[in-house]
């Protein structure tokens, strides 16, 4: 591991050592169930059945080989009614990796956080921060990092495999540094490789994708990013290969009202509030998801996502305190999906795919959703994130260094070791010290 050395002559304040919390959400269901259409805000790409091993052990095994890993928080998002069994299942899995300092965060720990919120008169914030919904789960990870004193956070997903022992070192590279123009690098994304070692979208340029060439647009963008300097402003975010500096997550939360695509949405939020996410073309891992929801149902979720995003971006342009983010600044991806006419494109794509793809029934349902539930959802909720943003910095200020909450959490979470399950002392968890690189060298690898 690249430990931070003592300062050399002329290097004052140019080195920074980072202590990231690694956060891994895992989603547990009672069986291979398909969520109801009426609950579009909490549909996951895939869940692990309670009686199945799932992908988490494979992920932790690969993380075991990574240099510099300090604390790992596994957030257990369980279907209602099986929270206790899911917690026991994940604790048993964590116990197989005694070399990792794993905190298993369950409904019990969440209740501790919420009770403290109430004591601090912040409200319980049950929708915005919790163990249900992609963004709420990520927000819980941010809150935990803030409470426990970590200066950064790295999100990975339980269906990923890390092959590079320097994964965290690459993730921390440049984080917290200033570019030549004085712009802080506060958020970074890497990229995914599939089972064949390819980073490109496999979405095909078929006739039924004429109005929805998302894969081609993404491939065009990532080819440009991979060919350029190591760090460049990103138009895309891989939420399972994402590093955030505390100065980013203390200011901005994830948006609990977006059904999926919360990672790209975070990029747009950062831009609206005057910051950015940087793409690191040397930082990657393998994404090996199991079979999840049907492609028609996934497209339905995309409809909710893009209509909501379009409405939200439109609303943001009416706010004088926000930076305007234009679709033209997000070419070739995702700009075209944030332009007027998105509803017509969605309808046409759903109809064409209902003919050309096997999942025709779900695509026909999706086409109907444009004019009904999805449009209404976007209209009803597009302002709520900005209202929550008035509250979020206060949450961060009030919980940072809160010894009562910190100690209560440390007493509650369990750390799995060779001797069994023990309570983790605070000192044992704050062990990572990863060099973010020399400022001068980082600046040579940044495209501005």
Task: For the regions a language model picked out, list residue spans one by one.
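N-proximal low-complexity "stem/linker" segments adjacent to membrane-targeting elements
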Residues: 7-68, 74-78
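Terminal low-complexity segments of carbohydrate-biosynthetic enzymes
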Residues: 11-15, 32, 77, 96, ...
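Active-site-proximal specificity loops/subdomain of glycosyltransferases
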Residues: 94-144
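Conserved nucleotide-sugar donor-binding
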Residues: 150, 235-252
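Conserved donor-nucleotide/metal-binding helix-loop-beta segment in metal-dependent transferases, i.e.
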Residues: 165-186
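Short beta-strand-to-loop element that shapes/binds the nucleotide-sugar donor at the catalytic cleft/hinge
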Residues: 183-204
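A recurrent flexible, glycine/aromatic-enriched loop bordering the glycosyltransferase active site
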Residues: 223-241
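Acidic donor-binding loop at a coil-to-helix junction in glycosyltransferase catalytic cores
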Residues: 259-266
């Amino acid at each position: 591991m690249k430990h931070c050395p003592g300062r050399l002559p002329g290097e004052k304040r140019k080195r920074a050592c980072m202590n990231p919390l690694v956060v891994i959400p895992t989603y547990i269901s009672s069986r291979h169930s398909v969520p109801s259409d009426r609950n579009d805000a909490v549909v996951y790409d895939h869940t692990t059945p309670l009686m199945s091993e799932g992908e988490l052990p494979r992920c932790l095994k690969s993380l075991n080989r990574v240099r510099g890993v300090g604390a790992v928080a596994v957030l257990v998002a369980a279907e209602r009614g099986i929270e206790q069994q899911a917690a026991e299942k994940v604790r048993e899995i964590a116990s197989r990796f005694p070399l990792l300092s794993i905190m298993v965060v369950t409904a019990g720990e969440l209740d501790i956080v919420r009770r403290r919120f109430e004591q601090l008169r912040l409200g319980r914030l049950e929708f915005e921060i919790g163990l249900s919904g992609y963004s709420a789960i990520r927000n819980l990870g941010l809150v935990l990092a803030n409470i426990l004193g970590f200066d950064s956070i790295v999100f990975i997903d339980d269906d990923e495999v890390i092959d590079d022992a320097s994964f965290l070192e690459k993730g921390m590279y440049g984080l917290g540094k200033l570019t030549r123009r004085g712009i802080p690098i506060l958020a970074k994304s890497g990229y995914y490789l599939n089972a064949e070692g390819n980073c490109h979208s496999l979405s095909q340029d078929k006739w039924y994708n004429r109005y929805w060439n998302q894969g081609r647009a993404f491939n065009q963008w990532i080819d440009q990013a991979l060919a350029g300097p190591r760090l460049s402003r990103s138009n895309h975010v891989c939420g399972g290969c994402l590093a955030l500096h505390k100065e980013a997550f203390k200011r901005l939360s994830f948006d609990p009202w977006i059904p999926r695509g919360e990672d790209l949405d975070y990029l747009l939020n950062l831009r609206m509030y005057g910051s950015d996410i940087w793409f690191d073309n040397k930082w990657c891992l393998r994404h090996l998801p199991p079979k999840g929801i049907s492609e028609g149902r996934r497209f339905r979720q995309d409809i909710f996502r893009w209509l909501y995003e379009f409405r939200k971006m439109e609303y943001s342009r009416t706010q004088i305190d926000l930076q305007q983010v234009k679709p033209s600044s997000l070419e070739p991806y995702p700009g075209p999906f944030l332009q007027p006419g998105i509803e017509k494109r969605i309808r046409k794509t759903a109809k064409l795919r209902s003919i050309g793809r096997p999942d025709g029934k779900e695509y026909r349902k999706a086409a109907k959703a444009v004019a009904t539930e999805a449009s209404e959802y976007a209209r009803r909720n597009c302002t709520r994130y900005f209202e929550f943003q008035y509250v979020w910095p206060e949450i961060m200020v009030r919980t940072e260094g809160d010894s009562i909450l910190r100690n209560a959490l440390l007493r509650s979470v369990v750390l799995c070791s060779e001797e069994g399950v023990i309570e983790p002392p605070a000192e044992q968890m704050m062990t990572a010290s990863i060099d973010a690189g020399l400022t001068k060298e980082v600046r040579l690898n940044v495209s501005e």
